[in-house]
Amino acid sequence: MNTQQLAKLRSIVPEMHRVRHIHFVGIGGAGMGGIAEVLANEGYEISGSDLAPNAVTQQLTKLGAQIYFHHRAENVLNASVVVVSSAITADNPEIVAAHDARIPVIRRAEMLAELMRFRHGIAIAGTHGKTTTTAMVTSIYAEAGLDPTFVNGGLVKAAGTHARLGSSRYLIAEADESDASFLHLQPMVAIVTNIEADHMDTYQGDFENLKQTFINFLHNLPFYGQAVMCIDDAVIRELLPRVGRHITTYGFSDDADVRVAGYRQTGAQGHFTLERKDKTLLNVTLNAPGRHNALNAAAAVAVATDEGIDDEAILRALERFQGTSRRFDFLGEYPLELVNGQSGTAMLVDDYGHHPTEVDATIKAARAGWPDKRLVMIFQPHRYTRTRDLYDDFAHVLSQVDVLLMLDVYSAGESPIPGADSRSLCRTIRGRGKIDPILVTDMDTLPELLSQALRGEDLILVQGAGNIGKLARKLADSRLQPQISE
């Protein structure tokens, strides 16, 4: 952003009084790093700490941020404010030092709310689909020439980053319900994609508490704001009478204000018609597979239509949509040397989905787009508590693939729970009689086990939210070699 653009932005968005140096504890996370990137581009001095470098910290370093790969008290002593990730505990030495020095310590969402305070905020919430929907809204606004600021939980491929500072009044952001911190946000427009029982430790195991929290989030909208909600979701349909704001619904349902009709899929593209409240139609080609992505697009179109964005810009953005990292992320089609000496090709897809509903949507999208391919899934369960709470759903959904290789549970800091481990889950799936899952307890054995499982012309789904994304890249870079045409 040049000096003239920054000056224009300053006329829209005032500086935070007395704040010059902002320190982030846990800066390597996508959400934290995205906010840090926007603030760095606004001219604030940025520092932060994390345990190891990654793409997020590398990008921030290029922008002039000081990154420490350790947690020490001295890291925060010159900061005006400390922003803390929800993964950081209160006994972290930087948090303790900040409190001792009377430096304000705030959560990530509080800083996001501050960015949103003087902007036209569009917040995307829901159990599933937040990241992709945020990217779709961003893509449409960018295509329309509105140059929005955005902060997303996943890398927006078209932009090559999780976040970017725009020159307009629009801020598009993913809103995180996992720790209820989205209640800090006060947007003008809020999308809710769906509501399911997840992160229930935050809500004391009470689903009614979770539902009421979403209603409270929507009531942060001004009375002239807009709630955009998926009416296909049974919980959202139940909650509609309790939402005291203007509502636009979307979905496949006949009574949706923005209705998806005639969906079909060819490869990675979805084709469908959107029927809007004013009876106008949009014939959409969406460069993202699956009925769930058609719903995400309908939400984005509802917001864009309300803003008055031209239909042609909407259609161009959706047809050119490049997606986000680790959301049905096509890593290439590669030749394979199989153990029987034959050759073949495998399509490699990396996907972040780690809840049964998300995994089911990925499987359905793969089946619809590539009906002749076998589905070979490498799955890493995420958290023992989620595996325990959704055990039967996982067993059902994972039984739908043709071959399943299951890694050990990615604990995310949790202690093991008896009966909520990968071995138990494999045993239960095997007992259903559809497939015989392969338990992978040693990652070094995975390439050989995968070679034995593949027949050629397969579709490999690398699925999960832990460190399995690194495995997908490793497979793409080493085990599977790109075909070289002569």
Swiss-Prot record:
ATP binds at residues 126-132. InterPro entries: Mur-like_cat_sf (IPR036565), Mur_ligase_C (IPR004101), Mur_ligase_C_dom_sf (IPR036615), Mur_ligase_cen (IPR013221), Mur_ligase_N (IPR000713), MurCDEF_pg_biosynth (IPR050061), UDP-N-AcMur_Ala_ligase_MurC (IPR005758). It is found in: Cytoplasm. One of its GO terms (molecular function) is ATP binding. GO terms for cellular component: cytoplasm. It catalyses: UDP-N-acetyl-alpha-D-muramate + L-alanine + ATP = UDP-N-acetyl-alpha-D-muramoyl-L-alanine + ADP + phosphate + H(+). Its EC number is 6.3.2.8. Keywords: ATP-binding, Cell cycle, Cell division, Cell shape, Cell wall biogenesis/degradation, Cytoplasm, Ligase, Nucleotide-binding, Peptidoglycan synthesis. GO terms for biological process: cell division; cell wall organization; peptidoglycan biosynthetic process; regulation of cell shape. SUPFAM superfamilies: MurCD N-terminal domain (SSF51984), MurD-like peptide ligases, catalytic domain (SSF53623), MurD-like peptide ligases, peptide-binding domain (SSF53244). Pathway: Cell wall biogenesis; peptidoglycan biosynthesis. HAMAP family: MurC. Belongs to the MurCDEF family. Cell wall formation. This is UDP-N-acetylmuramate--L-alanine ligase. The lineage of its organism: Bacteria, Pseudomonadati, Pseudomonadota, Gammaproteobacteria, Enterobacterales.
